[in-house]
């Protein structure tokens, strides 16, 4: 199953990064679904992360009934949805024992860091504050471990919304942890293309 996690800066779930992407995977023969998660003021207290973990758990619970391989669940996260997908693989949800994790990640121009190259608006929506210190809770490049699932990621060098440094920081962390990954960096292309 490929579970598509659209972006939208945690302000909305982008329609063009949801069903159209899922339909492309379906046309290639994959089971697909699109995660619609809490955004705006509803996104506080890591609710989107909880919803993603619950979705993965639900798919595994019904895997036989839905004819899905429970150990082959990939998340396709786009932009802020890439942050959410990567969070689902590496971020510990407080008070959630046996947190369901994906088996692979497909990330398109993901938000990764709350540091120098952050997409500040995503972190402000997620935390409800402009306080950069509060954003650090959701930075991900320092949470990569050898247990992180394999990653495919792509980004464009001229993305001005989510700087390519987000992907470069991720790649460095994946390399240091020995996590299998493949990356495609394109010279041209604005955010969302």
Residue ranges and their predicted role:
Residues 17, 140, 149, 163-173:
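Short alpha-helix in the alpha/beta-hydrolase fold that links the catalytic acid
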Residues 147, 152-155, 159:
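Short beta-strand/loop motif that positions the catalytic acidic residue
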Residues 164-193:
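C-terminal catalytic histidine-bearing segment of alpha/beta-hydrolase fold enzymes
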Residues 54-122, 135-136, 140:
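Primarily recognizes the serine-hydrolase "nucleophile elbow" in alpha/beta-hydrolase
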Residues 13-15, 20, 33-70:
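Catalytic nucleophile-loop/oxyanion-hole region of alpha/beta-hydrolase
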Residues 114, 158-162:
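Acidic catalytic loop of the alpha/beta-hydrolase fold
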Residues 128-143, 148-149:
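Active-site nucleophile elbow and catalytic-triad environment of alpha/beta-hydrolase enzymes
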Residues 1-7:
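Short beta-strand element of the alpha/beta-hydrolase
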């Amino acid at each position: 199953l490929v579970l598509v996690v659209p972006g939208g800066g945690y302000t909305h779930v982008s329609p063009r990064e949801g069903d159209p992407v899922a339909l492309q995977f379906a046309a290639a023969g994959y089971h697909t679904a699109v995660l619609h998660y809490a955004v705006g003021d509803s996104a506080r207290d890591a609710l989107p992360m909880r919803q993603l973990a619950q979705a993965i758990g639900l798919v595994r619970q019904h895997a036989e009934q839905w004819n899905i391989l429970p150990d082959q669940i990939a998340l396709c996260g786009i932009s802020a949805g890439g942050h959410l997908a990567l969070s689902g693989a590496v971020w510990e949800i407080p008070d959630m024992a046996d947190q369901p994790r994906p088996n692979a990640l497909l990330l398109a121009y993901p938000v990764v860091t709350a540091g120098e190259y952050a997409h500040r608006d995503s972190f402000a929506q997620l935390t409800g504050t402009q306080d950069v210190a509060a954003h650090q809770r959701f930075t991900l490049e320092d949470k990569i471990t050898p247990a992180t699932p394999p990653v495919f990621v792509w980004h464009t060098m001229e993305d001005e919304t989510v700087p390519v440094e987000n992907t470069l920081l991720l790649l460095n962390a994946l390399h240091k942890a020995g996590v299998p990954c493949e990356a495609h960096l394109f010279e041209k292309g604005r955010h969302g293309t």
